[in-house]
Amino acid sequence: MVRKIAIYGKGGIGKSTTQQNTAAAMSYFHGKNVMIHGCDPKADSTRLILGGKMQTTMMDTLRELGEGACTPDKVIETGFGGIRCVESGGPEPGVGCAGRGVITAITLMERHGVYENDLDFVFFDVLGDVVCGGFAMPVRDGKAEEIYIVASGEMMALYAANNICRGMVKYARQSGVRLGGIICNSRNVDGERELLEEFCERIGTQMIHFVPRDNIVQKAEFNKKSVIEFDPECNQSQEYRELARKIIENTDFVIPEPMTMDEMEDLVVKYGVLD
C-alpha cells in the first residue's frame, strides 16, 4: 500500500532539496517506486529529478487546456530513477489563491487514481509553514498520513517547526495524520544536534536523521542533479540513503505536543541561539 508523506518546513530551510535527494535515495538505493507532488507555486519541487527542467504545472495546464484535458499524461513527467513528478503550480502573480491550486491539483490526481498506481511512496512537498487552508490540505484532509518537518538549529526554523506541529494537532484526530519525525538539515551552528534532540524530546517525537552540511549538495544543484545522481558513492549520498532507510522502516508516529512561546524562548536561550 502506498505511503503518502508530506514534507513541511520553513521557507529556505532546504526542504525541497532534502525531499528530492531522499526520494532519489529511496529509488536508487532501496528500489522503491516514488512520486513527488510539488505543492509550491514556485514549482521547484522536482527540478533536480528532471535534470533542472521546470515542468509545466497543473494550474498552467488547466488554464490553457481546461479541466477535461488536464490528464496525468499531460502533467506527470518521469525523471531520475523512474520517479514520477507533478507540480501543482499556482495562479498568475497577484491574482487568486495558490493554496486553492494545491486543493484543485490533489483532487484531480485523486480522481485519476494516480496515487494508487504501483507506487510505494508519494511525497507532497509543501510551501513553507502551514500558512492557509490550501497548504494545510495534506494534513487537514488526510491526503498524507505521515508528516516530516525539515528544520535546523536556527531560531526561525524551530519556530516554524513548532507552528507546523500546532497546525497538525488541530487536524490530527480527524484526519489520522501523524508526525514521523524532524529531519535536521544542518546549518553548522553551535550545539545544533543537541538543540534539535531536546526540541524533539519536548514535542514528543524523534530526530529521524541529522543531515550534515556538505558543499556537494550545491555542486550537484549547479549540475541540475540530485546528489545521488551526481555522485552516488559520496558521503552525502550515504546520508540520504540512511535517511531514506529510516523513513522506510519508521514505525514511530505521534501527535506532537507543541511548545509554548515561553518554552521556545527558554530553549533557544539555553543553547545560545539568542544572545
From Swiss-Prot:
PROSITE patterns: NIFH_FRXC_1 (PS00746), NIFH_FRXC_2 (PS00692), NIFH_FRXC_3 (PS51026). GO terms for molecular function: 4 iron, 4 sulfur cluster binding; ATP binding; metal ion binding; nitrogenase activity. The keyword Lipoprotein does not apply. Binds 1 [4Fe-4S] cluster per dimer. Coiled coil: none annotated. CDD domains: NifH. It is an enzyme of class 1 (oxidoreductase). Pfam families: Fer4_NifH. Disulfide bonds: none annotated. The keyword Transcription regulation does not apply. InterPro entries: NifH/chlL_CS, NifH/frxC, Nitrogenase_Fe_NifH, P-loop_NTPase. The reversible ADP-ribosylation of Arg-100 inactivates the nitrogenase reductase and regulates nitrogenase activity. [4Fe-4S] cluster binds at residues 97, 132. Keywords: 4Fe-4S, ADP-ribosylation, ATP-binding, Iron, Iron-sulfur, Metal-binding, Nitrogen fixation, Nucleotide-binding, Oxidoreductase. ATP binds at residues 9-16. SUPFAM superfamilies: P-loop containing nucleoside triphosphate hydrolases. It catalyses: N2 + 8 reduced [2Fe-2S]-[ferredoxin] + 16 ATP + 16 H2O = H2 + 8 oxidized [2Fe-2S]-[ferredoxin] + 2 NH4(+) + 16 ADP + 16 phosphate + 6 H(+). The modification ADP-ribosylarginine is found at residue 100. Homodimer. Belongs to the NifH/BchL/ChlL family. The key enzymatic reactions in nitrogen fixation are catalyzed by the nitrogenase complex, which has 2 components: the iron protein and the molybdenum-iron protein. This is Nitrogenase iron protein 1. It comes from Methanothermobacter marburgensis (strain ATCC BAA-927 / DSM 2133 / JCM 14651 / NBRC 100331 / OCM 82 / Marburg). The lineage of its organism: Archaea, Methanobacteriati, Methanobacteriota, Methanomada group, Methanobacteria. The gene is nifH1.
